[in-house]
UniProtKB/Swiss-Prot annotation:
Result when mutating residue 1299 to A: Abolishes phosphorylation and decreases membrane retention
Name of the gene encoding the protein in the UniProt record: ACE
Name of this protein: Angiotensin-converting enzyme
Post-translational modification: Phosphorylated by CK2 on Ser-1299; which allows membrane retention. Phosphorylated on tyrosine residues on its extracellular part, promoting cleavage by secretase enzymes and formation of the soluble form (Angiotensin-converting enzyme, soluble form).
Residues annotated for Zn(2+) 1 binding in this entry: 390, 394, 418
Expression induction or repression: Up-regulated in failing heart.
Outcome of mutating residue 529 to Q: Abolished dependence to chloride, leading to reduced peptidyl dipeptidase activity
Provenance organism: Homo sapiens (Human)
Cofactor: Zn(2+); chloride
Domain Peptidase M2, chain residue ranges per copy: 40-624, 643-1222
Effect of residue 1127 to Q: Abolished dependence to chloride, leading to reduced peptidyl dipeptidase activity
Amino acid sequence: MGAASGRRGPGLLLPLPLLLLLPPQPALALDPGLQPGNFSADEAGAQLFAQSYNSSAEQVLFQSVAASWAHDTNITAENARRQEEAALLSQEFAEAWGQKAKELYEPIWQNFTDPQLRRIIGAVRTLGSANLPLAKRQQYNALLSNMSRIYSTAKVCLPNKTATCWSLDPDLTNILASSRSYAMLLFAWEGWHNAAGIPLKPLYEDFTALSNEAYKQDGFTDTGAYWRSWYNSPTFEDDLEHLYQQLEPLYLNLHAFVRRALHRRYGDRYINLRGPIPAHLLGDMWAQSWENIYDMVVPFPDKPNLDVTSTMLQQGWNATHMFRVAEEFFTSLELSPMPPEFWEGSMLEKPADGREVVCHASAWDFYNRKDFRIKQCTRVTMDQLSTVHHEMGHIQYYLQYKDLPVSLRRGANPGFHEAIGDVLALSVSTPEHLHKIGLLDRVTNDTESDINYLLKMALEKIAFLPFGYLVDQWRWGVFSGRTPPSRYNFDWWYLRTKYQGICPPVTRNETHFDAGAKFHVPNVTPYIRYFVSFVLQFQFHEALCKEAGYEGPLHQCDIYRSTKAGAKLRKVLQAGSSRPWQEVLKDMVGLDALDAQPLLKYFQPVTQWLQEQNQQNGEVLGWPEYQWHPPLPDNYPEGIDLVTDEAEASKFVEEYDRTSQVVWNEYAEANWNYNTNITTETSKILLQKNMQIANHTLKYGTQARKFDVNQLQNTTIKRIIKKVQDLERAALPAQELEEYNKILLDMETTYSVATVCHPNGSCLQLEPDLTNVMATSRKYEDLLWAWEGWRDKAGRAILQFYPKYVELINQAARLNGYVDAGDSWRSMYETPSLEQDLERLFQELQPLYLNLHAYVRRALHRHYGAQHINLEGPIPAHLLGNMWAQTWSNIYDLVVPFPSAPSMDTTEAMLKQGWTPRRMFKEADDFFTSLGLLPVPPEFWNKSMLEKPTDGREVVCHASAWDFYNGKDFRIKQCTTVNLEDLVVAHHEMGHIQYFMQYKDLPVALREGANPGFHEAIGDVLALSVSTPKHLHSLNLLSSEGGSDEHDINFLMKMALDKIAFIPFSYLVDQWRWRVFDGSITKENYNQEWWSLRLKYQGLCPPVPRTQGDFDPGAKFHIPSSVPYIRYFVSFIIQFQFHEALCQAAGHTGPLHKCDIYQSKEAGQRLATAMKLGFSRPWPEAMQLITGQPNMSASAMLSYFKPLLDWLRTENELHGEKLGWPQYNWTPNSARSEGPLPDSGRVSFLGLDLDAQQARVGQWLLLFLGIALLVATLGLSQRLFSIRHRSLHRHSHGPQFGSEVELRHS
């Protein structure tokens, strides 16, 4: 964009400090024939002076322009030297003739009668840089040369690479125009502004000082005053401001509309609808024209595409053809064709021979009246077709005024020169003209097509106005001193935000020089000419259309082939700068001033449309939040080459889904075969399938990581790719992956085949043998034998594997971008505040647990006596009816509040009635279908393992539900026992199956619960209904529905032993693992810290001393199987929220614990709607569908158990129970052995066998805990009162909850 006559080019490829140390270019002696002669000091002498000057100037200017051309089309040190020689010669010539003009005519030239002569002498007497002494002149030339060189040779290289580097044109220009990747655009933008701008700042400071020094000697206050003098108007600045104010409303409406479109594309993170637009998103390096993002903002996308770039390419257009088409437009107006020298000498494409060139498009006048050229790295695009006409406009101007004196071979003002080609481009870009030249199939002139066209033009013309206005506002401030070097960048961005409403996309400071990243600043080309030209061209267009006889909307006018219009234009061009521009303009348009009305008239239809659209959308015009800046993208700049193409992403997701169904099905089959028949062969096959699925995960995860998910718009595709990007264990190198898989298999196998043997040789497995012992025995020593034996066999054996497992799972997590494995597991909840939220929920439920704990401890004290139970201490962990003391329902007979009330144990009735495991699952299936949910398919009954095999096979008995990823095969594996507890478990597992069936049509990656807790909660929600006396009565398992207060308390106690007792255990398991993963628990302290947490949260202690050789966490299935556990805590909370919401949907009234949703289609529909979502939406949305609000809350659980809490509080107060365990360091064997162990030098402390130093540290730690517990206990009664008080006045928001039969996810 710009005429280039007499412009300075780049120079030596040396840094400025080094360049300034080189010897200056020697001053060349001016040929005596070019020196001024003797002339009389009057007007007649001045006429002779001007004629002599003209003939000499043509020679000097030809040499100077030829040297600049040679350099700009081949940037070498030699060409830079020759260019500087020519510059010095030009300056010496200017000095000689300028000084002579001042000497002869200074007092009288403004009084000459010939106005053209006055203009010539006035131009000659202005020496500019020739005023400087030789040394400063040489420094000035070197500065110009170096600034141009830095700009023209700047490159942006990919991070950590040198092979791929981009130049501005065409590389970075193409990226800014075509990329829709936020990060890639940012990298290109930031890279260019740093590479081109930063090195220029010190040079620009020195240039400013020298330039001002030179022009002050010509009588100007500074360089800016000289530049403004070309417009010969004392009110020039005020006139421009008035014009801008007239045009600003149109810009503001365009800005708001485009900002909304960018918001649709980039979202809230990167676009603030009340703030400025990040500068790199508008399709252009300087956000000066926005037509490259037309595809993102097109008002009516179904209308014909007005960007004809693709058609040009299809038709084989090249650069030369584009210039021939432009020439033909000019000649159709009977203007001049290009001379032969134009076609012979121009550089119309970027050279392919490796030369460094100045790509910025420019038109050149060689001042010999025949040689005119264009230098442009032309690309075949519609945008460049407009640029071609623009540059041809300059050439046409040169051709028309070539016979004027050299000093008058300029535009009437600089804006005139820029406007001519653009006037023709206004015709060329009309759909009618594009149709005429074969680039549009048809012309559609309906309103919608008009709006499309005008918006496209507005993106070029209106978007440019504030930038065209502000560049020289900034430079005038620099030249005047209002903007010192210490504020170059601050003031630049102040103006860009003030006028353009854009902001830098990355932090900028005064080390940056972002103005220097725009060609015209380092190349010292004034810019206000473009603002002027954008107003003038519409005045010209209106006048020429009228001359051509056109009637109709101004934006549809095409002056092609109008010789009348051509004649009118020719008259303007031929005048050059021989007359005041106001006169030339008046001859052309009938008005002698710049006028915005033709521009406003041209855009009036789209102005009105934009106003209506913005009002409908409630847009804020302007940017009141002007200080807002966007955040940096994640993984910037490493992630800049990520793919953002939606179609490519969609194709990838389809392929991933198709292949995943096959691979996951094969893996599930192998895993099932191993779990139902543990042999060397099945484990070998499973390891193979493990590697196969890891390879699949690695392959597609690696491909997925090539996508920038933040830039994708389709939320489903975005969610899938983000999930697939997490390679999990497959991120490990092959050898480590193989080791990891083997460790997992070894740990799980060790756990599954472990047995505990009596001295007589009979051995018991966990399921069902040891489980039965723990559930039914009331003998302290028998329970201790089973408890300790299981941990000796399972836990200790797993310890050898666990440290390496931790190392490898952490390594995998870090390779996936997480801090550690705990961070990875927590990410599944998509909740930054997860840990704080869970702690809050636990604190809300703790009073209920403490009261249950105290009550149960009293009952155990009655049974086992003071030797084994301390009423102020923790409970021995083996006495609670379960191997891990996680649920206490098996000791219901010891704690039943009202033993004389009717029994709720249905086991006897089930056995009498001949219930089988299959019948239990049939009843569960019936419950789901009664809600209008799906029945299980035939494959379920044919392939599930519902009982422990009797053929001697080793199996994994832990109950689990399985999805085989083919949409029809779903199974349960459970060593079912006919009792009420396993009936509840059957409903839990069937809940997983129902979830699988509901989301089976989703892509594989989304076939999961909304969060892991959701999957656990679904079956438990139904189990809450199944467990009610009412429902059990309907199954003929209870003789009555109950209904008395005593019956209710018994029922709630039984439920609390399941649900409330489980809360602290489900909370602490992953508290321990997260700390193991983050390193705060080391392998030396695995067991000690495990028991610290079990004491802190559960109020339990080991019944026998534990050592660090023990590994009691490993005696819990989920630890060796690497299954996250916090999901169960979550599920126990949310199942009560679901239950409350579904009871409301079913129309239930009355206490929540009596609700049975059986046969409620309304409840089923609400549940199905949420399950169908799978993992396709964030879990709060699924929560909203079920409960009407998006948060986890303990209120429903508290509401459910409120009658029991009231009863427990009364009972505990009656017996003077101490809530908590203030004697926290008591253990069952402490009366016998608290202190040094015989002959060992070791200490039994807190049930642990420790050395003395460890025990001392532990005592201090527990002293602190004791004080904290004491404070907590003192405040408890007030807390209980507060909870009770709130429950009477607060509407329940609905909770969630579930029974712990943990899902074994493949």
